[in-house]
Amino acid sequence: MKSSVSWLFFSSIPLFSSLSIVAAEVTLDSSNNSYDGSNGTTFTVFSTTDAAAGTTYSLLSDVSFQNAGALGIPLASGCFLEAGGDLTFQGNQHALKFAFINAGSSAGTVASTSAADKNLLFNDFSRLSIISCPSLLLSPTGQCALKSVGNLSLTGNSQIIFTQNFSSDNGGVINTKNFLLSGTSQFASFSRNQAFTGKQGGVVYATGTITIENSPGIVSFSQNLAKGSGGALYSTDNCSITDNFQVIFDGNSAWEAAQAQGGAICCTTTDKTVTLTGNKNLSFTNNTALTYGGAISGLKVSISAGGPTLFQSNISGSSAGQGGGGAINIASAGELALSATSGDITFNNNQVTNGSTSTRNAINIIDTAKVTSIRAATGQSIYFYDPITNPGTAASTDTLNLNLADANSEIEYGGAIVFSGEKLSPTEKAIAANVTSTIRQPAVLARGDLVLRDGVTVTFKDLTQSPGSRILMDGGTTLSAKEANLSLNGLAVNLSSLDGTNKAALKTEAADKNISLSGTIALIDTEGSFYENHNLKSASTYPLLELTTAGANGTITLGALSTLTLQEPETHYGYQGNWQLSWANATSSKIGSINWTRTGYIPSPERKSNLPLNSLWGNFIDIRSINQLIETKSSGEPFERELWLSGIANFFYRDSMPTRHGFRHISGGYALGITATTPAEDQLTFAFCQLFARDRNHITGKNHGDTYGASLYFHHTEGLFDIANFLWGKATRAPWVLSEISQIIPLSFDAKFSYLHTDNHMKTYYTDNSIIKGSWRNDAFCADLGASLPFVISVPYLLKEVEPFVKVQYIYAHQQDFYERYAEGRAFNKSELINVEIPIGVTFERDSKSEKGTYDLTLMYILDAYRRNPKCQTSLIASDANWMAYGTNLARQGFSVRAANHFQVNPHMEIFGQFAFEVRSSSRNYNTNLGSKFCF
């Protein structure tokens, strides 16, 4: 259809091109040609009559024409008049503006061509504006701004603004034979224009075609009014809107005239088509029509979505009488084709008004009209939140193809065609007309899904299902054959919609017609939450399906009963069990029920939280960082008595594992301590700390922890020779090795004992938008024993000391049992973490050049000799379902790099800082601190 439209319009272009070679060219610029009649000057009309050439006006700068005929006598004709040939405006990327022009009752207030088949063209403007040319107040008998007996085109412009224009004739802005809008790079805005009483086309009236195509910008028609038909566009030939970036029809209206129809578009001429194809974004919203087609009234309508396509809140009808087609109306003997090719098509909140009553309606198919195809490409959907109506008595014999591809097409139509009542209020759902769709044609579902949701009824003349397709029904929905049979071989029922009373229904309405059901009945959990229903903790029975025929001789065939089986989800979370299908016979009907037997429970990832367990690893990270802080503080210049304060921060990240979620721990706070040196030069430190922690897993849980702790540190240094001599005892003969040991080499011992208490507050964010909270307490204890052997090295500006060391560190952390105080809450048993690690490493120390500070670098290998990973029994409060939850597991070996600095500001103050990084095969830990100590 697109090719025929383009040929029709452009058939005149070769003639125009040949004429343009010899056309008279007139240049326009601001200084010589711009006009503003507010100063009382007289406007001279630009008028030419050369039939052989036509005229081209070429802009040299921005030009504007304002208030011509507005303050006195109206102009005798429009501003630009071409009586002989084509009239062309070449913008050369300049702006052209017309505002408040009054040409009395002359057509073409701005510009016109009057010779047969001559063209009016506007090309390559940075901005083309036509405002109030004329306005209703200025000229109640005024006519359209642009008039062409031939073709009118707006091509290659950056911005177009046509607003507040008025016409007492057809076409609120434009009246032409063929209209073309193409290549708009930024936007084309047509707003608040109107065609007066009984006239058509609030913006454009075309006795030929309307073509809007290939615009990378936004094309919008908003709040335009035709007091006849076609609130924005009216065409007596084809109307084609194709391959644009975004097209918007909002708030347009066709009103007042008795048969006003097509709130946005009207094209009802015999054999003519409205084609909407390949648009990246297309929307019809809030348009209204007095009678038919709140958005579109057409004989033939073909929509192929190139992106999201929306029909929303359009209305047909009024308090004076019933309308037809809230969004789209197809006239008698017409056709409709819908294809969601590269985007979804959605009909929502469109309505038909009849007096004081309104009902939902997407599409109205009048009597002998038909739907040729409704199809959605794989991955796309067509959503009918409003029903389809098909009034009349003469059912079409032409087949409606659902998801059938064209011959030799590479597009696979395996998407979903959805009829749903989910956007209706409870009051609206109670009205049958709001949930009942009828298409009086035989239908074939070729591929993909036909989906019935939330209480809707969908009726075809008859319905046949091809292999590889699926019909998915909610409980409480009905699929009906109005005049013939139902033959289905791929039925699925949405478990999430079953409440123990409602069921999916298949029925025939005509007497003695048959229902055939074969293959499998798939049980689908579309919301993924059905198996969390606590009714499943015990044996349950759900009505599933009712098959009903009319008349005494209708038959219900279930195929070979052995092959009519349930197809359950292969894997799912929640209650585990088995379904069994059973049938009960009644008069002219069969009722199928499914019986549930429970076998177990598998928690979903959002229920299977391991945050309480992993909070113990957070305590593990924090208590080790306190020990590292005290070590860093103590390695500086010793004072006899000192008070110190330091900030501290930790970041820990554990990758996800196949069976356990990843984990992140962030904490920060401060530590305050006091250190004293004994007469024997031993150091004794006591510290208090407060930390604020944030934990998060990779699913839906977050935890906030408030931590308080205390630490005791003892450091003692003894000569290596003295220790060896003591260990040898009072032997009569000292071993030779004793004589090889220097009497000045020290051996350092340190011991640290730390305790942390944490108040945890966890939030779990479920996919149904509920939030469940839980609180508990953790306690952690650490004992750390170590020894080091420092060696002094006299290498100026390189190294001062090398100190190998070894430690043994024991950490115990305990999580209190608790439960979440919600109906869907969980109970967590207590758990504990025990870890014994042996760090082995070496510290390199050097003096700064200023001799007021030191730097040190520590390299450390860590071996976890023993570990008990946290785990606990978890259960649902509302059920006896329980499972074992496991905390994360760190690799047993790691490597750490730690850099520290000490700077003595004066004899009474020192600043110290540290950055540490520990890596294991699947985790990373960063620690930093910065503080000061004061001598007193």
Swiss-Prot record:
* Cross-referenced Pfam families: Chlam_PMP (PF02415), ChlamPMP_M (PF07548)
The source's superkingdom equals Bacteria
Q: Which residues form the Autotransporter domain?
A: 636-936
In which broad location class does this protein mainly occur, judging by the first location in its UniProt entry?
A: secreted
Q: Which InterPro entries match?
A: Autotransporte_beta, Autotransporte_beta_dom_sf, Polymorphic_membr_middle, POMP_repeat
According to the UniProt record, one GO cellular component term is: extracellular region
Alphabetical UniProt keywords: Cell outer membrane, Cell wall, Membrane, Secreted, Signal, Transmembrane, Transmembrane beta strand
Any idea where this protein resides?
A: Secreted, Cell wall; Cell outer membrane
Say which family it is in.
Answer: Belongs to the PMP outer membrane protein family.
Q: What is this protein called?
A: Probable outer membrane protein pmp7
The species this protein was found in: Chlamydia pneumoniae (Chlamydophila pneumoniae)
What gene is it encoded by?
A: pmp7
